[in-house]
């Protein structure tokens, strides 16, 4: 038996996904700041909860301008539920790096989402600014879990939806 606390998400810590249009839902900026431990030059968020949703993906409390005052970076742990799709979008003027901790995911990308790349646990992924892409969990039973780092401290404000045949009504 482990002495470490159980940090698995419970139903009480999960949020509802964002409404159509992809806007994030979840904790307020004040709640995010309240979860941050400021050590005077080094800041920490301990045992972050899953509390925000965006475009079919759940995010643990991460670090961004909203809670640590970062200027150029944000970072989260993202969970793509079994069988879920994060509909096509682009990152405007910022880079994204991912490290897949668990699961298998497909990125369909390109102007018409005509290209694809499959990734699994242990893979690093780099997404250039402005590349249209859609994220698909390849399993109907297991989530994809990834560390996501962005060269944008605002997280979702500079993400734009693009057409997708999978998007409801789109």
Language-model segment annotations:
Residues 2-72, 87, 157, 161-170:
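A short, N-terminal "cap"/entry segment at the start of jelly-roll beta-barrel domains
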Residues 75-78, 97, 126, 141-158:
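A short hydrophobic beta-strand segment most commonly corresponding to one strand
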Residues 67-68, 93, 112, 140-142:
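Short strand-connecting beta-turns/loops that link adjacent beta-strands
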Residues 85, 94-121:
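A short beta-strand-loop-beta hairpin characteristic of the jelly-roll/cupin
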Residues 67-71, 80-84, 102-106, 152-154:
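Short, charged/polar surface micro-motifs in flexible loops or helix N-caps
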Residues 77, 90, 101, 109-111, ...:
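Residue-level recognition of conserved beta-strand positions in structured domain cores
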Residues 80-83, 109, 119-138, 150-151:
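Conserved metal-binding segment of the jelly-roll/cupin
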Residues 76-92:
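Conserved short histidine dyad/triad with adjacent acidic residue
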């Amino acid at each position: 038996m482990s002495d470490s606390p159980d940090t698995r998400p419970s139903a009480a810590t999960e949020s509802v996904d964002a409404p159509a249009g992809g806007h994030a839902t979840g904790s307020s900026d004040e709640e995010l700041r309240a979860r941050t431990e400021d050590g005077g030059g080094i800041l920490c968020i301990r045992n972050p909860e899953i509390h925000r949703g965006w475009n079919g993906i759940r995010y643990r409390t991460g670090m961004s301008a909203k809670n640590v005052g970062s200027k150029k970076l944000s970072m989260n742990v993202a969970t793509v539920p079994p069988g879920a799709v994060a509909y096509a979008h682009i990152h405007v003027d910022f880079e994204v790096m991912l490290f897949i901790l668990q699961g298998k995911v497909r990125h369909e990308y390109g102007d018409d989402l005509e290209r694809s790349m499959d990734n699994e646990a242990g893979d690093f992924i780099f997404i250039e600014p402005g590349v249209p892409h859609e994220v698909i969990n390849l399993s109907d039973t297991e989530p994809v879990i990834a560390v996501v780092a962005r060269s944008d401290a605002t997280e979702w404000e500079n993400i734009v939806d693009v057409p997708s045949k999978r998007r409801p009504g789109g």
